[in-house]
């Protein structure tokens, strides 16, 4: 669905970095690891939240 506001494991705020990460790493040609380093997302649990997230709102919305 939508990116969670906080990391499930440590509670650190990750939602504020999602838009920039999506623009630079997913739609651009930059390395996701370098983008996360520049954004200050350094914990492996928070990085997992950003890298593994898939936006499924458009897929699920027709069924509601």
Swiss-Prot record:
It holds the Pfam family RNA_pol_N. GO terms for cellular component: cytoplasm; DNA-directed RNA polymerase complex. The keyword Manganese does not apply. Its EC number is 2.7.7.6. One of its GO terms (biological process) is DNA-templated transcription. Part of the RNA polymerase complex. It comes from the Archaea. It is found in: Cytoplasm. One of its GO terms (molecular function) is DNA binding. This is DNA-directed RNA polymerase subunit Rpo10. Zn(2+) binds at residues 7, 10, 45-46. It catalyses: RNA(n) + a ribonucleoside 5'-triphosphate = RNA(n+1) + diphosphate. Binds 1 zinc ion. Belongs to the archaeal Rpo10/eukaryotic RPB10 RNA polymerase subunit family. Its cofactor is Zn(2+). Keywords: Cytoplasm, DNA-directed RNA polymerase, Metal-binding, Nucleotidyltransferase, Transcription, Transferase, Zinc. InterPro entries: RNA_pol_su_RPB10, RNA_pol_suN_Zn-BS, RPABC5/Rpb10. Gene3D superfamilies: Homeodomain-like (1.10.10.60). The gene is rpo10. DNA-dependent RNA polymerase (RNAP) catalyzes the transcription of DNA into RNA using the four ribonucleoside triphosphates as substrates. HAMAP family: RNApol_arch_Rpo10.
């Amino acid at each position: 669905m939508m990116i969670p506001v906080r990391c499930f494991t440590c509670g650190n705020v990750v939602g504020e970095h999602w838009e920039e990460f999506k623009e630079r790493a997913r739609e651009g040609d930059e390395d996701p690891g370098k983008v996360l380093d520049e954004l200050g997302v350094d914990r492996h649990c928070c990085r997992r939240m950003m890298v593994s997230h898939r936006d499924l709102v458009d897929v699920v919305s027709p069924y509601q």
